[in-house]
Amino acid sequence: MAPNDIISDMLTRIRNACAVRHPTTVVPTTKMTRSIAQVLKEEGFIEGFEEVGEGVKKHLVISLKYKSRGRQPIINTLQRVSKPGLRVYSNRKDLPRVLGGIGIAIISTSKGIMTDREARRQNVGGEVLCYVW
């Protein structure tokens, strides 16, 4: 059965895989999950990702990143902000800063999915999808 909220499903799979120190996790591929994975890779929270499978059965295999000693995950917290039942939007002036700039907020804008810093640079607002730190 397909989940209703694909973003929450993706974040939960990554969070659970980090908790048990798995090297990779698999999530269903959509344009949204691919874009979020790209932002996480660019910001250094994951090693990388690749698409496997064909047609409707495509999945993203996300390689998780850990600190060298003790295998501590780089991602401490993945927090969903905007949910299907309660959407959260922010204009360009009120974009959130996560932990004073240490973490990132992933924003869905009219120019694509990007971090809060990139949205400020491009002077756009949008839907606040999640916080990562």
From Swiss-Prot:
Gene Ontology CC entries for this record: ribonucleoprotein complex; ribosome
Keywords, alphabetical: Ribonucleoprotein, Ribosomal protein, RNA-binding, rRNA-binding
Pfam families membership: Ribosomal_S8
Membership in a protein family: Belongs to the universal ribosomal protein uS8 family.
Full protein name: Small ribosomal subunit protein uS8
Keyword RNA-binding tagged: yes
HAMAP family assigned: Ribosomal_uS8_B
Molecular-function GO term, any one: structural constituent of ribosome
Role this protein plays: One of the primary rRNA binding proteins, it binds directly to 16S rRNA central domain where it helps coordinate assembly of the platform of the 30S subunit.
InterPro entries given in the database record: Ribosomal_uS8, Ribosomal_uS8_CS, Ribosomal_uS8_sf
NCBIfam families (alphabetical): PRK00136.1 (NF001109)
Gene3D superfamilies linked to this entry: 3.30.1370.30, 3.30.1490.10
Organism of origin: Crocosphaera subtropica (strain ATCC 51142 / BH68) (Cyanothece sp. (strain ATCC 51142))
The keyword Protease is assigned to this record: no
